Swiss-Prot record:
The protein's name in its UniProt record: Glycerol-3-phosphate dehydrogenase [NAD(+)], glycosomal
Source organism of the structure: Leishmania major
Positions annotated to bind NAD(+): G23, S24, G25, A26, F27, G28, F98, A158, R275, K297, E301
Location(s), subcellular: Glycosome
Name of the gene encoding the protein in the UniProt record: GPD
Family, as annotated: Belongs to the NAD-dependent glycerol-3-phosphate dehydrogenase family.
Catalytic residues, chain numbering: K211 (proton acceptor)
Amino acid sequence: MISTKRHINTNELLHLSKAVVFGSGAFGTALAMVLSKKCREVCVWHIKEEEARLVNEKRENDLYLRGVQLASNIIFTSDVDEAYKGAELILFVIPTQFLRGFFQKSGGNLIAYAKARQVPVLVCTKGIERSTLKFPAQIVGEFFPSNLLSVLAGPSFAIEVATGVFTCVSVASADINVARRLQRIMTTGDRSFVCWATTDTVGCEVASAVKNVLAIGSGVANGLGMGLNARAALITRGLLEIRDLTAALGGDGSAIFGLAGFGDLQLTCSSELSRNFTVGKKLGKGLSLEEIQRTSKAVAEGVATAEPLVRLAQQLKVTMPLCQQIYEVVYKKKNPRAAIADLLSCGLQDEGLPPLFKKSAATPSKL
């Protein structure tokens, strides 16, 4: 068993000459702000040249993270080769549905560079690819060696990360020593951003994807005026759906009750800062998905994830009633109240939770 009782002191932290972030949305920009405390230079790749130039001039990414002044050592560029040249760490924060296309179109030299120099790759994207039903790290793993890959996940709203509000996340790799090295790189000296290492990459990716779908459901319940008790029930039962899918995909489940699992699920399902929660709330109030998307520039990843998630669950024969009903509300235009009624018509059931502790007849309960 891997011990989690490990403390990091400031002397253990690692600093780099340069890091590159591929993906310039709110979260990519926020992670660049974290890295600006650990690197001499941080380069952020943005797809449009003119927009990248304007960000550099204004020192603000007002498209996705308005009001946050960029650190002086952060540079935006639309040139892939310029972005990664000299980088000692590569982060991917490109939306899941566009990740493969990026590698196929622009990734050749980047991939060769990372392989030749053994540059660690941190996957920060969340979701499930529609065409293959793969998670982001699986997609990235088709192009980069597995020994370079880690996953970052956990409760981390971009605006708080970018402005140095205290945040804890998980860094996962199949090799705990790889995860611990990334932990030392990403944790900041002022402890405003702290990473915990784990080996449950599957659990981290499943939780990161499914929580966005569940957050839409939490928003729907809020829009219907269902209250906090309903939200707590959704979070609890939703966590079990994450558990069951993680088990079916071969994860060890250790991340489910950690930062990437319960932590991120609770946050995303409980705040108007969550784009997924906000989309769900508007659906609950009667707006159509088309109406919502016309007025929002930011991506609510749960919308893109719901459909492939349901197909993946069916393929693996995993029962996910909450995610199924959320999918039907989002894509089949099912009335949200009808979805709630269907969830509640399943009959009385046992809670279905295994005991955490073994109890023998010789040691009866003291309560």
